[in-house]
Amino acid sequence: MSPAFNASPNQLTLALSKGRIFTETLPLLEAAGIRVTEDPETSRKLILPTSDPAVRVVIVRASDVPTYVQYGAADFGVAGKDVLMENGMAGLYAPIDLNIARCRMSVAVPAGFDYANAVRQGARLAVATKYVQTAREHFAKKGVHVDLIKLYGSMELGPLVGLSDAIVDLVSTGSTLRANNLVEVEEIVQISSRLVVNQAALKLKRERLAPILDAFERASAALA
């Protein structure tokens, strides 16, 4: 690892992704007395300082948060349950459901498509998703025959252009589905974001981490 990236032994590094998770994590940080001093939406920096000189924030892709924490490039991070389900929890400790960035992972199909009948008839369905592992496990448990198509974005486009019969994606309000003439037919799992901690950091930096974890737990309990 580059020496320029390495934190001092007493410094804590928190991995966050831009967007909703970052925004909804800010009040939890403030509950721990920590304020991020730059906005990742306007700053070009990927390592952001905070009001606590011993804590810094690294901005990474949502799907990369567990990797940074697992390998110790970050001591702790915030990741969606969807990411953790898809990528596994090796080397991670996930002590707290933060009750933020809540949504659900669901199966959606074009309006008018009889999904239940297709399943009953044993039809083989093409399903577009970025959650291939999670979708595979879900459909296998239900005995549904599927061909999974890995996409990285714009899942709703799949059925519109004939790429897939259905999609598996995250749904919050459902407005994007409706705008693309899709309907939610099956909920797979409720999603929220979790605090994940590097197992080695939990042992070696427990004294520094414990007050922050306690503050996160208290603040997130109020959101439940």
Swiss-Prot record:
UniProt pathway annotation: Amino-acid biosynthesis; L-histidine biosynthesis; L-histidine from 5-phospho-alpha-D-ribose 1-diphosphate: step 1/9
One Gene Ontology term of the molecular function aspect: ATP phosphoribosyltransferase activity
Compartment annotation: Cytoplasm
GO CC annotations on file: cytoplasm
Biological-process GO terms, alphabetical: L-histidine biosynthetic process
EC number from the UniProt entry: 2.4.2.17
Superkingdom assignment: Bacteria
Swiss-Prot/TrEMBL catalytic activity: 1-(5-phospho-beta-D-ribosyl)-ATP + diphosphate = 5-phospho-alpha-D-ribose 1-diphosphate + ATP
Main localization of the protein described in the UniProt heading: cytoplasm
Keywords: Amino-acid biosynthesis, ATP-binding, Cytoplasm, Glycosyltransferase, Histidine biosynthesis, Nucleotide-binding, Transferase
InterPro entries named among the record's database cross-references: ATP_PRibTrfase_cat (IPR013820), ATP_PRibTrfase_CS (IPR018198), ATP_PRibTrfase_HisG (IPR001348), ATP_PRibTrfase_HisG_short (IPR024893)
Role according to the record: Catalyzes the condensation of ATP and 5-phosphoribose 1-diphosphate to form N'-(5'-phosphoribosyl)-ATP (PR-ATP). Has a crucial role in the pathway because the rate of histidine biosynthesis seems to be controlled primarily by regulation of HisG enzymatic activity.
Entry domain remark: Lacks the C-terminal regulatory region which is replaced by HisZ.
Subunit-level organization: Heteromultimer composed of HisG and HisZ subunits.
Similarity-based family: Belongs to the ATP phosphoribosyltransferase family. Short subfamily.
The protein's name in its UniProt record: ATP phosphoribosyltransferase
Organism: Cupriavidus taiwanensis (strain DSM 17343 / BCRC 17206 / CCUG 44338 / CIP 107171 / LMG 19424 / R1) (Ralstonia taiwanensis (strain LMG 19424))
Lineage: Bacteria, Pseudomonadati, Pseudomonadota, Betaproteobacteria, Burkholderiales
Gene name per UniProt: hisG
